[in-house]
């Protein structure tokens, strides 16, 4: 990328965005070329990343470059311009399907070892872990997030409002979340006084020390956490909520993020499935274990694997699963016509998309009969789920939002350098034995943070870099100055991590000229209430949030304001000086692909690409 010829790198990804790219990218090049702008493509699809990871298994002419690693390198250069389209954050079933498809095309990549038995299997699984989940975003997002609805898009939504379901004060829809034993209640935080190198280790009750992560390099001023979720508390919570939904006659739905949180949330998802179907699973445990059934991958894993059984045995298992529903609540459906439930696959119901859709529909989801119904929305982790309950309370009191008059809620998100939980995948572990989980300084042996944990608990260590926090505060002030909008930092005083963040935000705001700006810091629930009260008055409010709330709110408000999150302008000013421009905040729209196959019609809206291209050319 020389100064003589500006270059835009346009990513090739997956599903609907990739199909749209075949039509749109040639047009971009046709207009860019006479202007002296070079437009290069870079394939970071799931398939390309699998092939790059296992190039040693391929013939010479089948090998592809590691484009993701190269893009990661380019984010550190000051003149980089990347247009990034949505890509699949592959769940295990999606990853396994991609592997099978590649093998059928003649690529000798290894099978995905769901249950590794040998060291070789474990090594292969570790390599596939680099491709699964949100493997792309932590590499490319070397800056914080600026997401907003462009004025023209907002005005169009006001003049041509999308459909919105009616809210009733009698709605029984509510969020169910853990009151103890989750990450929120099991969190400790520390602001580092100096640069350190630490390890994560488990001291078992039997006296053995297991090093789970031998080395994590940390800088002065970085914030680290030790947080865990109790398996016992989680399963107890599920049983209580399933029983409550059955007794009260309300539909049951589970909302997690098993794609992005690729280590922790498939486990959280799987425990719910196992508790729900515990009678059938207990009866057939031996054969299900022999088949290697893993419902962390959804009920689809069970149905696929029992296909290998004799017909009568298979039918008995299916009948026993169906019999469970006689004393369990109705399940929310992903596809009522095809009988696909909330438990089919962990990637089917993703909290940041499913909760806004439910709220837009008047607090309802679809049941088995194809009708919309009130639901118990189970969000196990309470850290962020309370904001949804606050919005539900607001809607029950004030009614549905009006797209023709409501204000807008842009977001400035703390995202750079794999901030917070979204960067913790390589530091997240399912505890193998009861013991004490410690974060230890490698040089001094000092235990920085410690937790008592039990077998099956999920323990993780998020890291938030001081430089990323400074840049986030700067971006929030800049957006306040440019837009004239009020900014609210959503930071709880009761959560240890956010208490540390509040201190830094207050300190770093002093580095900027904030005269004439309205900048506030509020706990999450207060911030939601304050923002909603302004929204219904047509007032605009920038939400400055951490990484998970960035993800949640940049779906929640656009879906209510615009009908979709795909029409957002999503800019990532890279900390090295370049820019990454994400095309909206939506996903890769697999249903669009299904419709294309069935009807030969692609309904993908490329407005996000146009917006990103415009910002990139500027």
Residue ranges and their predicted role:
Residues 2-270, 278-504, 508-618:
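Extended, well-ordered protein cores
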């Amino acid at each position: 990328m020389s100064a003589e010829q500006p270059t835009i790198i346009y990513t090739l990804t997956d599903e609907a965005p990739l199909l749209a790219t075949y039509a749109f990218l040639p047009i971009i090049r046709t207009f860019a070329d006479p202007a002296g702008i070079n437009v290069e493509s870079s394939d970071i699809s799931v398939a390309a990343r699998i092939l790059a990871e296992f190039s040693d298994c391929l013939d010479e002419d089948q090998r592809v470059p590691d484009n993701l690693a190269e893009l990661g390198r380019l984010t550190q250069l000051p003149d980089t311009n990347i247009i990034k389209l949505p890509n699949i954050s592959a769940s295990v079933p999606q990853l396994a399907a991609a592997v099978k498809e590649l093998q059928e095309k003649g690529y000798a990549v290894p099978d995905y070892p769901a249950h590794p038995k040998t060291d070789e299997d474990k090594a292969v699984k570790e390599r596939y872990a680099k491709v699964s989940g949100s493997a792309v975003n932590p590499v490319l997002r070397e800056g914080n997030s600026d997401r907003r609805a462009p004025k023209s898009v907002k005005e169009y939504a006001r003049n041509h409002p999308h459909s919105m379901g009616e809210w009733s004060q009698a709605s029984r829809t509510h969020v169910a979340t853990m009151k103890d034993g989750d990450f929120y209640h099991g969190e400790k935080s520390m602001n580092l006084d100096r640069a350190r190198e630490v390890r994560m280790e488990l001291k078992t009750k039997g006296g053995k020390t297991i090093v789970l992560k031998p080395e994590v390099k940390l800088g002065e001023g970085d914030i680290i956490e030790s947080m865990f979720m109790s398996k016992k508390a989680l399963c107890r919570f599920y049983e209580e909520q399933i029983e409550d939904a059955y007794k009260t006659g309300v539909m049951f739905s589970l909302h997690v993020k098993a794609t992005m949180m690729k280590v922790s949330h498939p486990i959280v998802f799987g425990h719910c499935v196992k508790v729900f179907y515990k009678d059938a699973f207990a009866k057939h445990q031996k054969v299900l274990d022999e088949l290697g059934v893993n419902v962390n991958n959804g009920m689809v894993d069970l149905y696929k694997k029992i296909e290998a059984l004799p017909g009568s045995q298979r039918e008995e298992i299916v009948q026993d699963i169906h019999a469970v529903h006689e004393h369990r609540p109705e399940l929310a459906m992903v596809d009522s016509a095809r009988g696909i439930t909330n438990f089919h696959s962990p990637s089917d119901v993703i909290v940041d998309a499913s909760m806004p859709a439910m709220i837009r529909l008047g607090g309802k989801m679809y049941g088995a009969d194809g009708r919309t119904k009130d639901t118990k929305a189970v969000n196990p982790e309470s850290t962020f789920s309370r904001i949804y309950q606050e919005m539900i309370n607001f809607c029950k009191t004030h009614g549905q939002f009006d797209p023709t008059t409501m204000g807008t809620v842009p977001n400035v998100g703390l995202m750079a350098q794999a901030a917070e939980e979204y960067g913790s995948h390589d530091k997240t572990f399912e505890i193998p034995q009861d013991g004490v989980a410690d974060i230890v300084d490698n040089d001094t042996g000092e235990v920085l943070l410690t937790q008592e944990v039990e077998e099956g608990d999920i323990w993780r260590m998020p890291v938030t870099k001081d430089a990323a926090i400074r840049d986030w505060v700067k971006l929030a002030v800049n957006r306040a100055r440019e837009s004239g909008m009020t900014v609210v930092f959503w930071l709880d005083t009761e959560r240890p991590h956010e208490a540390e963040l509040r201190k830094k935000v207050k300190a770093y705001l002093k580095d900027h000229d904030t005269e004439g700006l309205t900048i506030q810091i509020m706990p999450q629930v207060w911030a939601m209430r304050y923002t909603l009260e302004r929204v219904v008055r047509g007032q605009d409010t920038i939400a400055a949030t951490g990484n998970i709330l960035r993800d949640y709110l940049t779906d929640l408000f656009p879906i209510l304001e615009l009908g979709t999150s795909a029409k957002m302008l999503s800019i990532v000013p890279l900390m090295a000086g370049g820019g990454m421009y994400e095309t909206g905040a939506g996903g890769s729209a697999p249903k669009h692909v299904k419709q294309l196959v069935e009807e030969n019609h692609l309904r993908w809206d490329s407005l996000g690409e146009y917006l990103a291209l415009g910002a990139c050319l500027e």
